[in-house]
Structures are given as structure tokens and as C-alpha cells.
A protein has these predicted regions:
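GHKL (Bergerat-fold) ATPase N-terminal catalytic module, capturing the glycine-rich phosphate-binding loop
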Residues: 1-180
């Protein structure tokens, strides 16, 4: 018999549901995870700004939480490094793909910069998906520092995701908007 290799196939929505519900028992964990992501994004912008000053911004580092009871969403905004369309797809479109883990590897390869990595939090790439414990739709709008194009990533956590060009009301950073489930 000839040998052949095949990739595993999976029902992504079921795996995502298992990952979310087995890792997290506290529904409020999503807020900590998203705030950690925002903090990591700011740290990445600061770190990369040391060698590329255009990435630094004149504003203070900011993370903002917005609650809109009328439209039933919670939004976490930051002025961190932001993402481009490829990074959105790679990071948010791949379960257990951590942008922080990749960044830590980059720092590890450049041993002189290890101290910059000490305060980065998210390393496993699943914390973001805890948002689907409380939201039926998640919308991420982001603009990578040093670019002038913004993108929006939208998913219901079941059928996949869409990425499109977007308008953004601040020059860099990310907004994660969770449209809260009815239950």
C-alpha cells in the first residue's frame, strides 16, 4: 500500500465552541482577555516604534471601554499597533494562532530585546474567542500603525468571517465591538 498524508478536517464552529467553553467557566473572562490583547497591542507599537519612530504616536497610550445599552454592544478600543488585512486573517481567522506568540519569537530571535517581551500577556491565541461566550457577533475594526488603510473583520463564531476595507475614526489601533447575546 502506498503511503499518503492527509490533513485533519474539522467542523470549526464545533471546535471553537469546545475550546471556548472548556477553557473558560467565567463568562466575564472575555473582558480581561480583550483588555490583555489591547495592552499587548500598545506594547508592540511601543517596541516597534523604537526602531521605526513613525509608529509612535503623540497621544498617550489609551484603552477605552464603551458600553452602548441601546444598541446592545460593548466595545474595547486601543491605540496599539493595529493589524492589516493579512494579519487579521492570520490572527483572528486561525484558532490558536497568537500574534503575541509570533512577536515573542521575533524578540527571542533578537536576544537584545527580551525585556520588551516581559509584559506581553496573550501567548496562546484563544483568549479573543472568549468574546463569543457573550456575543453573537464580533466586529473588529483596525488600522495598522504606519498605514492609511483600515479593515473590519466580522464573525458570528459559527460560519466563518468577513474582512472588508473600513473607515476608522482614529489614526491607528483597534476597536473590538461585541454585539451581546440576548440570553
Amino acid at each position: 500500500m502506498d503511503k499518503f498524508t492527509k490533513s485533519f478536517e474539522a467542523d470549526t464552529s464545533k471546535i471553537l465552541n469546545i475550546v471556548i467553553n472548556s477553557l473558560y467557566s467565567d463568562r466575564d473572562i472575555f473582558l480581561r482577555e480583550l483588555l490583555s490583547n489591547a495592552s499587548d497591542a500598545i506594547q508592540k507599537r511601543r517596541f516597534q516604534g523604537q526602531t521605526t519612530p513613525i509608529l509612535l504616536n503623540s497621544e498617550d497610550d489609551q484603552i477605552e471601554i464603551v458600553i452602548n445599552k441601546k444598541k446592545k454592544y460593548i466595545e474595547i478600543k486601543d491605540n496599539g499597533i493595529g493589524l492589516n488585512d493579512e494579519e487579521l486573517s492570520e490572527t483572528l481567522g486561525t484558532i490558536a494562532k497568537s500574534g503575541t506568540a509570533g512577536f515573542l519569537k521575533e524578540i527571542e530571535d533578537n536576544k537584545d530585546s527580551k525585556s520588551a517581551a516581559q509584559s506581553l500577556i496573550g501567548k496562546f491565541g484563544v483568549g479573543f474567542y472568549s468574546a463569543f461566550m457573550v456575543a453573537d457577533t464580533v466586529e473588529v475594526t483596525t488600522q495598522k500603525a504606519g498605514t492609511n488603510v483600515a479593515y473590519t473583520w466580522v464573525s458570528d463564531g459559527q460560519t466563518g468571517y468577513d474582512i472588508s476595507k473600513a473607515e476608522i475614526d482614529h489614526p491607528i489601533g483597534t476597536s473590538v465591538r461585541l454585539f451581546i447575546k440576548k440570553d
